[in-house]
Every structure is written in C-alpha cells, then in structure tokens.
C-alpha cells in the first residue's frame, strides 16, 4: 500500500514559494572540481544532506541561494531542519540528486557537464535568466520551483512510491489521472487533443514519461495556488 502521508508534497502550503534567501546557507567551493563533468562550477550548496546545487561563477549569489532556499522549503515544509520524508531523503542522497545552474543554454559548462556526467541525479537544469528571487515560482518569471520539483519527483518519488508516481504508461495513479486529463492515453502527441481534455501539453520534445513529470508539477503548483 502506498504510504499516502509521504506524498504530502502535493499538498504543500503556498508559503513554500515565498522561500527567503536569508536561510542558513553558505555558498561553498565546488567539492567536485576535479571531476571533469563538474569542473566548470565554482559555487556549491548542499541542501539538507541530500540535494546539491552547482553553479557557474557568473551566477549571482542571490540566485544560487534562492535555488537552495526553494529546495529546502520543498523538502522541509515544516522548517524543523529535517527532510519531511526520511525515505525521500535517503533516495535523493543515494542517487546524488542535484540541479546545475548554467549561465545560458549551450554554455561551455553545460556542454561539458552533459558530455561527461554519468550519474542518475540530474533530472533538470536552471539557467541564470530564468531565476528571479523576487517572483518565486511564478510562471514566466522564475522557473526555480518547477525545476527543483522535477528533480525531487523524478529522482525521488517515482522510485520510492511507484504505485503513486511511476511515469510509464498504465503504471500508477499519476499516469491514470494524466490519461483522463489528456482525454485519453497518447503515447505520441496527438495533432489535436479531444474536447474533453484539460491538459494540453504540446512540447514535442517531451515523451510520455516526461509528460507525466510535467503533469505532476502542474498538480503541485495548482495546489500551491501559483
């Protein structure tokens, strides 16, 4: 049976998107600078001993701190200094969950990272121009909440609670709900969604599993009120 108390991430308070950058984080030097994949990052924050932030030197400190604050709020919504779900913490740590922050799409650091990274912990990235600490989580202004949620879901929840969150067709409560929202099960993108569909995600680079991760994100931020 799925431990539904563990999926409380879906019911997070709207306060989570108002994470402040004055939390108790310090930006450290990159501890993995000798690794080819990580060699272009100079800024690093370890969040709650299970989630890492890596950033290029050109990323302003306030944006790096903002990403760390959002991750901390999502993982520790009651702000007691511990990840709310210890099983999730263990899974994220075991898989090396991380989010890299690049100067821009296609930067040399980004190319180097994806040419050499062979881990399981990178499910999303951030770019400098899509982080806005003054508008946390708001669509079109700040992508931090979206991308951090993607990492937590893809690296954590899909693995530890597959009955709820697995992303393959016919595999979970999530995919069943998404198929209803899309007006049917579409492994490939339809040319047009049925009239009864209310989830019309149309990014043709996003396959079925990607669609499920995006749908879970929209469920979460809808509950947040974003």
Language model region names:
Residues 18, 70, 215-216:
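Generic detector of isolated residues embedded in canonical secondary-structure elements
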Residues 20-49:
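N-terminal low-complexity, Pro/Thr/Ser-rich intrinsically disordered segments
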Residues 38-40, 48-189:
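Acidic/His-rich structured neighborhood in mature extracellular/periplasmic domains
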Residues 170-226:
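Metalloprotease/metallohydrolase-associated module, dominated by Zn2+-dependent proteases
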Residues 6-9, 137, 205:
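Residue-level detector of alpha-helix boundary/anchor positions
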Residues 1-20:
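Bacterial Sec-dependent N-terminal signal peptides
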């Amino acid at each position: 049976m799925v431990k539904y108390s563990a999926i409380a991430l879906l019911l997070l308070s709207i306060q989570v998107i108002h994470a402040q950058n004055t939390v108790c984080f310090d930006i450290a030097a990159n501890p993995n600078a000798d690794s080819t994949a990580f060699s272009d990052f100079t800024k690093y924050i370890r969040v709650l001993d299970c989630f890492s932030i890596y950033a290029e030197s050109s990323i302003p400190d306030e944006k790096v701190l903002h990403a760390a604050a959002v991750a901390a709020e999502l993982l520790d919504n009651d702000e007691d200094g511990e990840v709310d779900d210890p099983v999730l913490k263990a899974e994220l740590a075991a898989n090396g969950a991380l989010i890299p922050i690049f100067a821009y799409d296609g930067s040399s650091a980004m190319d180097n990272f994806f040419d050499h990274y062979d881990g399981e912990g990178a499910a999303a990235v951030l770019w400098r121009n899509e982080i806005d600490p003054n508008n946390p989580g708001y669509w079109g202004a700040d992508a931090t909440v979206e991308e951090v949620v993607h990492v937590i879901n893809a690296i954590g929840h899909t693995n530890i609670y597959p009955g709820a969150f697995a992303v393959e067709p016919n595999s979970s409560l999530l995919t069943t709900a998404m198929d209803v929202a899309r007006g049917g099960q579409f492994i490939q993108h339809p040319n047009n969604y049925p009239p009864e569909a209310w989830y019309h995600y149309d990014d043709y680079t996003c396959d079925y599993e990607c669609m499920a991760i995006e749908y879970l994100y929209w469920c979460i931020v809808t509950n947040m009120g974003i």
